[in-house]
């Protein structure tokens, strides 16, 4: 090999003895500091070894630099030393090492062995290993099969956030499949997140500022208190998932919350208050206070996944929802107005409320199917309102 980090040993041209000692090593260190490791292959040993250019066995002065190099896994395996320890803006151990599953016996292992051998501990706090990308049928992608998915083309057609959302939704610790059908399903999930953000903004932008219009938790309407309790529980799940690098779990918690609990239940139940109650009334401000909390939560939780979408939403957000920041990446993690323990105290009421809603909804559906359900709506505006 004519590249790589050389093993700094020499061979005596006169007797074949291998030569490597403190004097030669000091000379090589000085050479590398001045010219870099490539000088090993370009400079004659006698030009930098000086008096140490001598064979201890036969006394000859004709030393030839050996061409062997260190294993490339040794090179990368000491990056914690060459990079993390020497650069003041970095930390050692590193927060996380991220690589493919083929590095279990490569970089991950060589880094672990060298760091433990030198310092007695791992060079990383966590390891995140990813599998390989296969087509929808689980086959390796190849041009001959015509099953290659070009991420640049997907970005052009669907947007980068679709790829980011797909990556977050699958278990990348093992091999994952992708094709146009899978991306279409991902695109549908993306629209659900985006539409939820749009709805929240439609009830907040230019109408509500949490810092001046917000309602304290103790004064919220009962339904709104239940939603704050629920979002607090979901946030705890998302925090734990992100801390464990379990991105699919974070995605699933957010997706289920948005689709099942927000769109299908809570946001639907708020529409009477949001559309009919007087602006500035407690009933409406109570609802908007929770919408602002939901928006603040989703901005922060979705930022690692839907970076571009969240930045787009930031442009229309009330300043108090986004800490007066311009970019979502600068936001701190979401903090609920109540603790998880306080939220858990509402668990029984929340379950009973959902069971009651389910029973009422079923009764209404049965009555509608039987043709016995009638709904009459009367409006009677006062002269002042008219």
Regions found by a protein language model. Name each.
Residues 1-205, 227-270, 290-300:
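Structured secondary-structure scaffolds
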Residues 26-34, 47, 325, 348, ...:
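Polar/charged alpha-helical tracts
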Residues 63, 207-236, 267-363, 370-371, ...:
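Acidic, turn-prone loop/beta-hairpin segments
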Residues 381-385:
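A short, hydrophobic C-terminal helix/tail in secreted or cell-surface proteins
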């Amino acid at each position: 090999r004519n590249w790589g980090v050389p093993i700094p040993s020499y061979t005596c041209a006169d007797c074949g003895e291998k030569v490597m000692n403190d004097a030669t090593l000091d000379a090589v260190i000085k050479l590398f500091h001045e010219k870099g490791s490539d000088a090993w292959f370009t400079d004659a040993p006698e030009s930098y070894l000086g008096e140490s250019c001598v064979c201890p066995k036969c006394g000859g002065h004709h030393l030839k630099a050996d061409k062997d190099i260190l294993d490339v896994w040794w090179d990368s395996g000491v990056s914690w030393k060459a990079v993390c320890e020497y650069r003041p803006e970095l930390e050692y151990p590193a927060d996380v090492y991220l690589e493919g599953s083929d590095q279990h016996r490569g970089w991950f292992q060589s880094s672990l062995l060298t760091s433990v051998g030198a310092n007695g501990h791992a060079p990383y706090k966590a390891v995140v290993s990813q599998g390989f990308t296969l087509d929808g049928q689980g086959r390796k992608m190849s041009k001959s099969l015509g099953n290659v998915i070009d991420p640049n083309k997907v970005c052009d057609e669907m947007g980068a956030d679709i790829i980011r959302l797909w990556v977050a939704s699958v278990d990348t610790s093992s091999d994952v499949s992708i094709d146009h059908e899978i991306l279409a399903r991902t695109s549908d999930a993306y629209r659900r997140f985006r539409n939820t953000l749009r709805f929240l903004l439609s009830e907040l932008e230019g109408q509500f500022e949490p810092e001046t219009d917000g309602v304290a938790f103790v004064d919220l309407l009962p339904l709104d208190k239940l939603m704050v309790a629920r979002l607090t529980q979901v946030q705890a799940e998302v925090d734990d998932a992100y801390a464990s690098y379990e991105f699919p779990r974070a995605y699933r918690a957010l997706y289920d919350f948005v689709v099942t609990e927000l769109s299908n239940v809570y946001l639907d139940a708020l529409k009477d208050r949001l559309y009919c109650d007087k602006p500035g009334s407690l009933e409406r401000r109570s609802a908007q206070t929770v919408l602002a909390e939901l928006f603040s939560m989703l901005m922060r939780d979705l930022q690692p996944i839907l970076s571009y979408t969240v930045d787009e939403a930031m442009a229309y957000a009330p300043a108090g929802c986004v800490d007066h920041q311009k970019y979502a990446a600068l936001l701190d993690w979401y903090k609920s107005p109540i603790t998880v323990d306080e939220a858990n105290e509402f668990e029984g009421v929340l379950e009973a409320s959902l069971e009651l809603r389910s029973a009422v909804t079923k009764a209404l559906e049965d009555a509608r199917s039987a043709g016995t359900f009638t709904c009459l709506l009367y409006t009677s505006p006062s002269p002042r309102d008219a």
